[in-house]
């Protein structure tokens, strides 16, 4: 208000200093034009439209009554719109907050979610989810391994049973009932351990082979084992007829002396010489052992290692048989290589010396 009054004061003085013209009346000296309030002052004061109309600036400094009235009106109008301006400001703040909230929601949706906004939040979320995923993955791996082992056992049992049934069925269909019976009995045959002596690098080695009882080598070995105890048993001496013992004579015998004589009993066969066990051992020792080359010796050592059940478990033996016979078909080159590497690592860890 003071700035408005000060700005209008020079205008009133200039009007008073101007000379009176012939067209002006005597009342022009007392005329003071009303000053319009500036837009800047109205904006700074925050007055509403009603306050703008009530503000009136006077140019006459001597009129104290008009100045006091104007000051009172200005104070009243300034007090009245204060609450309205505060409410308007609060409404503006609420609208701005709502707009900011909506804008943030749009940014979150465009970024792909709340967890992708900040790097720290994203890393913390990834670390927490990674630990949970690791535990879940370990449990899933263990469950898959157990399931695969169970399925492998079932497949192996079904394949062994189906192969034997197919052979028996084929033999029965062709009318070869003897071979069908042989195959059915072979499935239940017991294995026979046969010692084998061989020579390698100037040294004698003895290995044990497990063969079915129907194998020719097994039959030969069993026949030799049966013949050796039979030869060692002593045969009972045959009773010899005593020539010194006279036969009792009777009247009937004398009367029938003229009749043809009865046939004489057969003479006992001469006894064979009993072979000693030492001769059998010497014969076995004098037999020339089989000479092996490096490849045959390696194969024999590998077979001996596989036959030792104290070093390999049944599951490892089954896996070894599967890999040896089938060669990892259908698994792919890399898959078969990884399976073999894992198997060899397990065997190495199991058989490692402390």
Swiss-Prot record:
Compartment(s) where it occurs, according to its Swiss-Prot or TrEMBL record: Nucleus
Amino acid composition bias (Acidic residues), ranges on this chain: 24-33, 60-70
Domain of life: Eukaryota
Residue ranges of every copy of the BCNT-C domain listed in the record: 272-354
Record's subunit section: Component of the SWR1 chromatin remodeling complex.
Physiological role: Component of the SWR1 complex which mediates the ATP-dependent exchange of histone H2A for the H2A variant HZT1 leading to transcriptional regulation of selected genes by chromatin remodeling. Involved in chromosome stability.
Family: Belongs to the SWC5 family.
Name of this protein: SWR1-complex protein 5
Organism from which the protein derives: Mycosarcoma maydis (Corn smut fungus)
Gene: SWC5
């Amino acid at each position: 208000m003071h700035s408005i009054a000060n700005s209008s004061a020079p205008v009133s003085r200039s009007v008073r200093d101007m000379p009176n013209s012939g067209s002006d009346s005597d009342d022009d000296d007392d005329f003071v034009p009303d000053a319009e309030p500036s837009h800047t002052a109205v904006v700074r004061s925050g007055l509403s439209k009603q306050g703008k109309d009530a503000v009136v600036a006077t140019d006459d400094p001597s009129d104290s009554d008009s100045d006091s009235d104007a000051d009172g009106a200005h104070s009243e109008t300034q007090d009245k719109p204060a609450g309205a301006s505060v409410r308007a400001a609060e409404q503006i703040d609420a609208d701005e907050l709502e707009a900011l909230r909506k804008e943030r929601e749009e940014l979150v949706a465009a970024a792909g979610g709340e967890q992708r906004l900040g790097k720290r939040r994203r890393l913390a979320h990834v670390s927490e989810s990674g630990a949970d995923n690791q535990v879940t993955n370990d449990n899933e791996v263990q469950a898959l391994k157990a399931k695969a082992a169970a399925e492998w056992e079932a497949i192996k049992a079904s394949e062994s049973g189906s192969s034997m049934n197919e052979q028996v069925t084929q033999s029965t269909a062709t009318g070869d009932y003897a071979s069908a019976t042989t195959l059915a009995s072979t499935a239940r045959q017991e294995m026979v351990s046969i010692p084998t002596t061989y020579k390698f690098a100037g040294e004698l080695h003895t290995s044990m082979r497990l063969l079915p009882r129907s194998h020719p080598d097994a039959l030969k070995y069993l026949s030799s084992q049966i013949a050796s105890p039979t030869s060692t048993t002593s045969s009972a001496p045959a009773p010899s007829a005593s020539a010194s013992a006279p036969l009792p004579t009777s009247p009937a015998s004398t009367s029938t002396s003229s009749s043809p004589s009865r046939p004489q009993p057969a003479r006992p066969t001469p006894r064979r010489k009993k072979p000693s066990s030492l001769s059998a051992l010497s014969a076995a020792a004098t037999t020339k052992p089989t000479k092996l080359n490096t490849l045959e010796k390696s194969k024999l050592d590998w077979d001996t290692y596989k036959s030792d059940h104290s070093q390999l478990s049944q599951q490892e033996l089954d896996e070894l048989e599967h890999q040896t016979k089938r060669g990892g078909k259908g698994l792919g080159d890399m898959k078969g290589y990884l399976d073999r590497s894992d198997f060899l690592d397990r065997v190495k860890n199991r058989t490692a010396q402390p």
